[in-house]
Each structure stands twice: as C-alpha cells, then as structure tokens.
C-alpha cells in the first residue's frame, strides 16, 4: 500500500515481466472511473501519480541482476470481472511519460501471470485472456516455474496480434568514426 497525494491510499502489487509495473486492481481501490476510453485522461493522471508516488517512496524496485531495470515502468489498472467480450480481465497500462498502451501489454501480462501463479489462481497450462482499453486481446499462460538465481519465477507465454505500422531504413557513412553507436552516461 502507498498513500498518494491527492488520491489517498492505493493497494497495488508489484511484479516484473520484462519491466516492473504497479498492478492496481479496481476492486481493491476506490476510483471514480472505470477502464473505458471515456476515462483515459483520468487513467493517465492517476496512473502517473501512482507511478511517481511509488518511485519516490518504494526503494524495493530492484532487479536482482540488471541494475538498469531498477525503476517502475508504469501502472496497470486491472478489472478482474469477466468482460462482455468473454475475456477474463481488462487492463489499462499507463507507462513511460503518460502513454496508454493500445494492447494489454506483453510484459504486463507476463507480470500478471506471475502474480496469478503466486496466488494459486491458476495452474501451469491454464490460459487467461486479457482485454485492453481498445478491445484487443492477449492470452497468457504459465508454461513452467523455475528459479532465477535464488528467486522463484515463472516462464510465461503470451499470445496476441501485432500489426506493422511503419518501416525504417538506417544508413551510415563508412567514414563515420562512431557509426557503430555510442553511449553517454
């Protein structure tokens, strides 16, 4: 739990599935909105306040082996009620600097699979379907459990649809002394 200025006490789960997310279940919190397009601005504003509140107070966001992943990427609001579409759950991912994902978020679904497996909500091989704010669907399952170093983990499988939205061609001049890239830190 965390107290977020202007919102109040927020109950959330923290999980990693390629990035760290705060999973905020609507049933465990009191929000004046639901997960619909009409409330996207409230979702963004609230999601960013929660993310910033957690980042400013929760110093437990530490990846055990990759220091550059020691941050909260976003807030995922979840509604675990069966949806009219037939999906098991609906979620909205507010990430980065206030963007909303068009899909249920692959890394977010991976983290949710870990949460559901930890709570014994599902067994290996059980399939859950997740719907996004746009209506797109991902399916997730846990295919195995294993140790990641000394940490319990799951190997999730996520299935969804992706669409090509553009193409890019990069070129470099062979005389460019940093044509292979550079990094400043």
Task: Mark where each language-model region is.
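Active-site proximal loop and beta-alpha junction motif in alpha/beta enzyme cores
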Residues: 1-185
